[in-house]
């Protein structure tokens, strides 16, 4: 598998664009993705009971498992906007269908930005016309920039692999920085591939990888109204349709998991005001669910986040998070390690105090990527979660978001 981190190379049959429509004060704010051929899709949405209008629309349209275009705007979430919000989301899809000469039902809509403000539809509809005229094979970068809100860098990856002599390309790009919490929050992710994949197979692969990647990240514990992750597979590589239980499926799954994992880590790394990426590895748990519960609790703990920001090896906060996570474990067996490029230090042994080198721990925590390893010593299962520290800048950014 060839890996192109940070690169967007649109697969066969896909074009994209990103333009300035005027929703935001400046910068690109409207993206369009189009496939020459109707594609199989799978999608996962926010679990927040308060769902944005485009999420409500997409959840219904995604049931048929087909789509040909996605329109995305940033700067306005079109959430908590009532029936008018639903009408506006439908109008966006209708406009895309008109300019691309495709079926309206084959258009998905995504929005991200400020909640509770109506969309400036005149600007949006005009922007869609411009975006359609701007579609190109090189337009992926513009599209990726157009979906960003408080993001500080582009989040993208492309992988290439071969299936039975057919070259497959898979590219993904995402946005997400704040209001990120396990089970999908304020993040949009789009994975495009020219592979031919059976619908049921695509569904299983995508939902499994989402569960192990996007659903294992946390920036601030807030859950958004707009989360959406979509994969489109248009089959234009002309390979035999991939089915579960085959060698070809294993290749496809590995590629999809890599793309989603890479994007999830980048989202965690770009947490609003973040100075450090945190990766939590819970190992030797009794069950996978126990490992997931513990890993998610640690990465979501504000006390752990602030300790990492302050470069304080406060292992008690880590153990406390495991304690309230709901995981089944014996506290008298738990070991905790802190690790980075500067080395590794054990800070807790068998659930209690361990005489560790404080100066080494301080050096370890000075790095930009910090690994927390929790050994439950209870079984064979493991889970990984990603997050970031919590800094003073997080408050500054979110205290003035609307201004």
UniProtKB/Swiss-Prot annotation:
User: Can you name this protein?
Assistant: Arginine biosynthesis bifunctional protein ArgJ
Question: Could you tell me which species this protein originates from?
Answer: Caldanaerobacter subterraneus subsp. tengcongensis (strain DSM 15242 / JCM 11007 / NBRC 100824 / MB4) (Thermoanaerobacter tengcongensis)
Q: What does this protein do?
A: Catalyzes two activities which are involved in the cyclic version of arginine biosynthesis: the synthesis of N-acetylglutamate from glutamate and acetyl-CoA as the acetyl donor, and of ornithine by transacetylation between N(2)-acetylornithine and glutamate.
Question: What is the active site of this protein?
Answer: 186 (nucleophile)
Query: Site positions for Cleavage, renumbered to this chain?
Result: 185-186
Is the Transferase keyword given for this protein? yes
The record's similarity note reads: Belongs to the ArgJ family.
Marked site, Involved in the stabilization of negative charge on the oxyanion by the formation of the oxyanion hole, at 112-113
Q: Which gene encodes it?
A: argJ
Could you tell me which InterPro entries the record lists for this protein? Arg_biosynth_ArgJ, ArgJ-like_dom_sf, ArgJ_beta_C
Q: Does the keyword Cytoplasm apply?
A: yes
Q: What class does this enzyme belong to in the EC scheme?
A: transferase
Q: How does it assemble?
A: Heterotetramer of two alpha and two beta chains.
